[in-house]
Amino acid sequence: MSSGGLLLLLGLLTLWAELTPVSGKKRPDFCYLPADTGPCMANFPRFYYDSASKKCKKFTYGGCHGNANNFETREECRKKCFASAARRPT
């Protein structure tokens, strides 16, 4: 095989390795919990992972209790639930 062919193969394998882990990992169970404002009456803007739409969505958190599907930023939500997986844990 020529050096150009090897370089192309190496590039394709690198691309495949970068894309494969996203679909091979499992989402944490808390990513499947519904948004939970909790019983308190504060108004904190937060984000939760909506497993039906597969998106991080904004909601208002009351400030206490709730659940672990509660993130201060959309980026944090994506890091924990969106980018880490493509299928629900079994």
From Swiss-Prot:
Molecular-function annotations in GO: serine-type endopeptidase inhibitor activity
InterPro entries according to UniProt: Kunitz_BPTI, Kunitz_BPTI_sf, Prtase_inh_Kunz-CS, TFPI/VKTCI-like
Subcellular localization, as worded in the UniProt entry: Secreted
SS bond partners: 31-81, 40-64, 56-77
SUPFAM superfamilies, per database record: BPTI-like (SSF57362)
Signal peptide: 1-24
Expression by tissue: Expressed by the venom gland.
SMART domains cross-referenced by the UniProt entry: KU
Residue stretches spanning the membrane: none
Annotated site (Reactive bond for chymotrypsin): 41-42
Principal cellular location given in the protein's record: secreted
PROSITE patterns: BPTI_KUNITZ_1, BPTI_KUNITZ_2
Key words of the record: Disulfide bond, Protease inhibitor, Secreted, Serine protease inhibitor, Signal
Cited PANTHER family: KUNITZ-TYPE PROTEASE INHIBITOR-RELATED, TISSUE FACTOR PATHWAY INHIBITOR
Function, as annotated: Serine protease inhibitor.
Family: Belongs to the venom Kunitz-type family.
Name of the protein this chain belongs to: Kunitz-type serine protease inhibitor bitisilin-2
Native species: Bitis gabonica (Gaboon adder)
